[in-house]
């Protein structure tokens, strides 16, 4: 239950300083300790507020807080704030790792959610012998405005999770850390079981029968929930008619049902290597809603007519029943398009490839940037230990599906908006000038020139294209540009989509795994089913839960990656690794280790003397070997699994070259996160 804030949101004057008090949700960086507050009212405060670790004041990741901000930072500093009050804890439990034992019933533990490297006193449950490295579930402490001098109160242990050396317990720890429920309540399972294949037959008369239409799915080889199928036909003028057929989840998950309430609570599915926490029970997600081949399935079909040049001329949206003819994988489609294999779909797939290329060219013409970001798939053994990092590559089949889904999302957003109905847009606002200037400076220091468009705007599209297709700094530069941009989110206000350069955009194509898409389906056919106030609540909840799931997925990957790097330290302690510098300043050196797709940092005090920099060193005074993009060699000094801290150092002598640590880079194992 929310408590009444002691400090009301708004402006307050303290001496000569005007402070703004803004309510929002706190997100704490699990490894670096700082946080960001996402304001409750993004229309009034359309930015996240940076909070240094020292200014969290006992606030934890996920807390609903009030942050105080000085609106006019001094000396060009970034806008940052201090937590003034915690209105409500975001979690009732924390996960801690014992780092030292004080007595048989008390210990000190590390928890990443506090945003601090300091250790927390813990009162242990009796009846067990504990060891350093034990992971335990703890009760969240109440927030105290002005904590008393002296030691922090001990947190109560609730449950034993497992020792840090037990990789099988990683999932349970992350699940508890982010409060992700895997099991569904009995009433939800029971409600899902009421539907069967017979139910589809009973509603055929009320739908467009498309069971004879040649349509099929394209997904990863491991996918089980097939949201979308595609088709391609032609009209009498030989214009393209692209069909995108999406599982009609809204037919089964009706407003205020048990299924609906649980889906609204989860907001989305969360994906881990070899495992998923679904938004819907498997009876729906893997069965009745999944567009499996050669079975009747209920769908929402979007038929879009495109001219020979690839421009939209007409569209239709209606409920249908389809029967997918093939379940294709990305690899199969790539082989067919590259003419390595013959297949009954060869002709239509090549025609789809032609249309997809037209869409891609149009996107490029309007200034849309296609990013190449570092991404790996983690391969785990039966003990859940990482055995390989497999580099992902987006192939043509991925781009084909991406282009088709983007078109469907755009058309649906345009359609609902022009019906005069409020909807959840997928918004992506332009970066602020400060971040863009910082990126321009970074690119310049890496040796790149920023050209300008005819309207005298910096041509980031051209810059990033010149670093694509295997450029050694491709992933570094693209990653830094993405970081300069704002995070995409949901909003009932249409702010456009900067990354896609679209005026209308929403999420419609993945209702099995995203609650927003389910809401959009409802608005298509029953626009009065959701009032504005309720829609605003849904939009905020889905934006927040999306970030929570992303953090959980990243935390799991980082933990496994730490295990993987530790394995190489134990087996190859003298190995040097190739890295590229990201930033260099008086605080230290940050870099990306390409072999592990991992960002590291070496504090200034630990750097060789020739790598030291003065506090206000000008970019032109930085030696070439320390400039962003410069190549360096690093070694692993130590790995602390308890805190997931990896200590690196500059390689000063010729060391062993790294042995092969990856399998042959694979084609991207399809991800469910298709649309931006």
Curated annotation (Swiss-Prot):
Residues 659-676 have a biased composition (Basic residues). 3'-5' exoribonuclease that releases 5'-nucleoside monophosphates and is involved in maturation of structured RNAs. It comes from the Bacteria. It catalyses: Exonucleolytic cleavage in the 3'- to 5'-direction to yield nucleoside 5'-phosphates. Belongs to the RNR ribonuclease family. RNase R subfamily. It is found in: Cytoplasm. Its EC number is 3.1.13.1. PROSITE patterns: RIBONUCLEASE_II (PS01175). Coiled coil: none annotated. Pfam families: OB_RNB, RNB. Transmembrane segments: none annotated. Residues 207-527 form the RNB domain. GO terms for molecular function: exoribonuclease II activity; RNA binding. The keyword Hydrolase applies. It comes from Chlamydia pneumoniae. This is Ribonuclease R. SUPFAM superfamilies: Nucleic acid-binding proteins. GO terms for biological process: mRNA catabolic process. Residues 656-676 are annotated as: Disordered. Gene3D superfamilies: Nucleic acid-binding proteins. Residues 566-651 form the S1 motif domain. Keywords: Cytoplasm, Exonuclease, Hydrolase, Nuclease, RNA-binding.
């Amino acid at each position: 239950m929310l408590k009444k804030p002691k400090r009301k949101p708004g402006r307050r004057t303290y001496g000569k300083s005007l402070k703004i008090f803004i309510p929002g949700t706190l997100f704490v960086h699990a490894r670096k300790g700082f946080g960001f507050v996402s304001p409750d009212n993004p229309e009034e405060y359309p930015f996240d507020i940076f909070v240094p670790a020292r200014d969290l004041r006992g606030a934890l990741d996920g807390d609903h807080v009030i942050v105080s901000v000085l609106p006019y930072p001094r000396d060009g500093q970034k806008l940052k704030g201090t937590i003034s009050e915690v209105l409500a804890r975001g979690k009732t439990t924390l996960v801690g790792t014992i780092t030292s034992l004080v007595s048989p019933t008390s210990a000190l533990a590390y928890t990443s959610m506090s945003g601090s490297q300091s250790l927390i006193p813990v009162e242990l449950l009796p009846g067990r012998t504990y060891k350093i490295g034990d992971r335990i579930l703890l009760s969240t402490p109440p927030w105290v405005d002005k904590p008393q001098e002296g030691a922090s109160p001990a947190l109560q242990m609730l449950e034993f999770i497992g020792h840090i050396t037990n990789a099988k317990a990683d999932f349970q720890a992350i699940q508890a850390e982010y409060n992700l429920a895997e099991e569904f309540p009995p009433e939800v399972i029971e409600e899902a079981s009421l539907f069967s294949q017979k139910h589809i037959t009973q509603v055929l008369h009320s739908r467009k029968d498309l069971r004879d239409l040649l349509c099929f799915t394209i997904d990863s080889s491991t996918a089980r929930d097939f949201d979308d199928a595609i088709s391609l036909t032609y009209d009498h003028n030989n214009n393209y008619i692209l069909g995108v057929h999406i599982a009609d989840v809204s037919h089964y998950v009706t407003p205020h049902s048990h299924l609906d309430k649980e889906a609204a609570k989860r907001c989305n599915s969360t994906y881990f290597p070899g495992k998923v926490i679904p938004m819907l029970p498997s009876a729906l997600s893997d069965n009745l809603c999944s567009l499996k081949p050669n079975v009747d399935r209920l769908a929402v079909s979007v038929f879009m007519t495109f001219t020979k040049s690839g421009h939209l001329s007409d569209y239709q949206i209606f409920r249908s029943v389809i029967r997918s003819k093939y379940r294709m994988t990305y690899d199969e489609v790539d082989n067919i398009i590259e003419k390595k294999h013959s297949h009954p779909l060869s002709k239509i797939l090549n025609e789809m490839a032609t249309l997809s290329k037209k869409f891609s060219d149009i996107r490029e013409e309007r200034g849309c940037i296609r990013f190449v970001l570092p991404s790996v798939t983690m391969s785990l053994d039966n003990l859940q230990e990482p055995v390989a990092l497999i580099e992902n590559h987006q192939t043509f089949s991925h781009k084909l599906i991406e282009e088709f889904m983007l078109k469907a999302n755009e058309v649906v957003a345009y359609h609902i908006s022009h019906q005069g109905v409020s909807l959840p847009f997928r918004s992506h606002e332009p970066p602020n000038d400060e971040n863009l200037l910082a990126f321009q400076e970074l690119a310049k220091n890496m040796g790149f020139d920023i050209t300008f468009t005819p309207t005298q705007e910096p041509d980031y599209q051209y810059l990033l294209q010149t670093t694509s297709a295997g450029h050694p700094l491709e992933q570094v530069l693209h990653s830094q540009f993405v970081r300069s941009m704002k995070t995409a989110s949901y909003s009932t206000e249409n702010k456009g989509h900067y990354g896609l350069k679209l005026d209308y955009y929403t999420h419609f194509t993945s209702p099995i795994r995203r609650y927003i898409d389910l809401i959009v389906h409802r608005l298509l056919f029953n626009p009065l089913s959701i009032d504005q106030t309720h829609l605003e609540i849904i939009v905020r909840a889905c934006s927040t839960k999306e970030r929570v799931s992303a953090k959980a997925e990243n935390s799991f990957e980082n933990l496994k990656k730490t295990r993987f790097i530790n394995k190489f330290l134990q087996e190859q302690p003298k190995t040097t690794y190739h890295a590229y510098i990201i930033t260099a300043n008086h605080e230290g050196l940050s870099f990306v280790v390409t072999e592990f797709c991992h960002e590291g940092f070496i504090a200034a005090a630990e750097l060789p003397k020739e790598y030291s920099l003065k506090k206000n060193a000008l970019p032109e005074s930085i030696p070439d070997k320390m400039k962003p993009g410069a190549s360096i060699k690093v070694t692993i000094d130590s790995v602390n699994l308890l805190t997931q801290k990896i200590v690196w150092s500059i390689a000063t002598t010729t060391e062993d070259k790294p042995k092969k640590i990856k399998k042959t880079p694979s084609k991207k194992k399809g991800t469910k996160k298709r649309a931006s």
